[in-house]
Amino acid sequence: MFKWCSNTYKLEYFAIIKFIFKTFLWAQKLHLQCLNGGESAMKVVILAGGFGTRLSEETHLIPKPMVEIGGRPILWHIMKCYSHYGFDDFIICGGYKCDVIKNFFNHYFLYTSDVTFDFKRKKTEFISSKAEDWRVTIVDTGLDTMTGSRVKKIQHLLNDNEPFFLTYGDGVCDLNFRDQLNFHKSHGKMATVLAVTPPGRFGSMTIEGEKVTKFIEKPQGDNCGRINGGFFIFNKPFVRYLTEDDCSLESGPLDRLACQGQLVAHEHDGFWFAMDTLRDKNKLDDLWKRGSAPWKMSDRANYQHSAKINPLRALKG
């Protein structure tokens, strides 16, 4: 029978077991990435720099993507949706109050961890953490920069010869992003846009077959058909359509792609919702509180045990 010689050996034994367990988890994740052809390394670009003026009740203190739904920023919810399908490498294009986003993620690991502060030995020990296995790059792309120019300014961070996801920091959906990626690869065009069917205050598209033949930023009237859902996949060469000055993603580059037959619609009939007003925010909050949030990926995301994080608290830390 094995006999402990001292507490030191006991501690070393548990340290070895912990190391072996972490190595196993790392190897398992690497194996899954290989099975998926390395696709989990794809970049997810999130536009998070606008002023959010229609939601000024919240955005006078924090940027719109940091407005909380169920105690967490909507930005976090969006990232959870991508992460559920194995896409964990994020580039956040900040602007207005970008420091709030940086502070949130700077403190995120601490706030989601069980931790021991040993003041006597001047040590901090993280016992366990509920933080996601994400890589998050935050770039201040300018206060007044337009959407297309924000993407242009982070082009050096994108992987060569690989498509990238792009979305806005204010909308959630129940889309299967791996299905969207497979769809994008199947048609061989420059870009894929999610096409959804809510109210007509968003950009509309004319679709023939699967190809988008016309892109209209904000149509008039109720009969506007499917609209731009704001969840895109682009091939890397798309950045050539962009400039660093006064380039709106929606009114110029997307329309050019449509005219060239390089923009394809991925039609989605599931849940989709954009948070533009306080009423929208309250609706999402209500869905969350009732436990009926369609975008919640509960089988992988441990939402129930996620501690509430107030981004304003991070500014004081």
Give names to the regions the model predicted.
Residues 162-165, 172-173, 177-185, 197-200, ...:
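Catalytic-core segments of class I nucleotidyltransferases/pyrophosphorylases
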Residues 38-103, 107, 138:
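N-terminal glycine-rich phosphate-binding loop and ensuing alpha1 helix
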Residues 44-46, 92, 166, 191-194, ...:
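Structural beta-sheet core signal
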Residues 100-209:
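Conserved beta-loop-beta/alpha segment of the NTase-like Rossmann-fold superfamily
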Residues 16, 21-41:
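Short, Lys/Arg-enriched N-terminal segments with co-localized hydrophobic residues
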